[in-house]
């Protein structure tokens, strides 16, 4: 059984004070002087800081301020359809084959995998857990906007969350699963009432720090999910940055951080592309 994202989130979120975790104030851009870094927010306000750590993911707004140039993530040519459902929602025959196994099926230009994860509150007891499936499928860049259009007709740049997928698109997904997948996996796809979708992107930063700015996690390296190292990579970045800041002046700490983590990010990103090239 694997741990789930929401379990990790709650564990770390509990360590942060309410006043230190601010929602609803999106950052538009980042800049800096010799004395401070500045955040320009979408609401027109500004915040000043000694150091800004951009842990803002695939669409990072901190990234261009670090690299000094436009630095978009590059679409890799395929998407991951995903489902996360109570194990009790699986038909009995499918559950007997899929639960407590890392199941995998490959076909031309596509593959699907699935595994059991903890329940919504970290439950590990049989019957209280969830089943997570991921179905990789090739989608042309020209079709991507249509696939990432939500129920309100808005086009999203990277993903659709649970509940955002139009029912008509879900029905097509279920029908495709019935035609293309083994019955246990097809049943798992059909059992998910709110599938979600993640487009797969690549990005490698040429640098992780600049002045009073640093990149961390997917803001620095967007790696393919096949590596199963996205969380571990970000955690490694965070621990390395913390270690440096705890013992060195910030400028020296950032240099040490980049020296340690940049080659690791390059290696993981390369490994992910190798795995993705085997799709199908």
For the regions a language model picked out, list residue spans one by one.
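Short beta-strand or tight-loop elements
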Residues: 23, 35, 108-110, 193-196
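Short, flexible hinge/linker loops that cap or flank conserved catalytic cores
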Residues: 46, 127, 206-209
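Conserved FAD/dinucleotide-binding core of flavoprotein oxidoreductases
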Residues: 4, 90-188
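Short, glycine/charged-enriched secondary-structure capping and boundary segments
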Residues: 36-37, 66-70, 96, 148, ...
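Histidine-centered metal-chelating micro-motifs
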Residues: 60, 80, 111-113, 220-221
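Conserved N-terminal helical subregion
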Residues: 1-86
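Conserved mid-domain beta->alpha element of the FAD-binding
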Residues: 53-54, 81, 133, 168-172, ...
């Amino acid at each position: 059984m694997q741990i789930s994202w929401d379990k990790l989130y709650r564990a770390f979120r509990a360590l942060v004070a309410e006043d230190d975790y601010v929602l609803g104030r999106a950052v538009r851009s980042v800049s800096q002087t010799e004395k401070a870094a500045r955040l320009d927010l979408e609401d027109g306000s500004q915040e000043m800081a000694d150091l800004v750590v951009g842990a803002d993911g695939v669409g990072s707004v901190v990234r261009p301020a670090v690299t000094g140039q436009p630095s978009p993530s590059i679409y890799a040519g395929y998407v991951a359809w995903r489902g996360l459902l109570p194990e009790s929602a699986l038909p009995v025959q499918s559950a007997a084959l899929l639960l407590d196994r890392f199941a995998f099926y490959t076909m031309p230009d596509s593959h699907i995998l699935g595994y059991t994860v903890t329940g919504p509150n970290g439950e590990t007891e049989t019957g209280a857990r969830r089943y997570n499936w991921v179905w990789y499928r090739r989608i042309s860049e020209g079709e991507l906007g249509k696939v990432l259009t939500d129920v309100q007709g808005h086009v999203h740049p990277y993903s659709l969350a649970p509940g955002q997928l139009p029912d008509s698109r879900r029905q097509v997904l279920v029908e495709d699963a019935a035609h293309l997948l083994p019955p246990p996996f097809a049943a798992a796809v059909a059992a998910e009432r709110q599938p979600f979708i993640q487009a797969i992107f690549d990005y490698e930063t040429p640098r992780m720090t600049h002045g009073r700015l640093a990149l961390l996690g997917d803001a620095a390296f967007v790696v393919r999910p096949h590596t199963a190292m996205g969380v571990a990579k970000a955690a490694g970045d965070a621990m390395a940055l913390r270690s440096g800041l705890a013992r060195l002046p910030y400028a020296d700490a950032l240099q040490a951080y980049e020296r340690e983590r940049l080659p690791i990010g390059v290696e993981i990103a390369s490994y992910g592309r190798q795995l993705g090239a085997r799709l199908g």
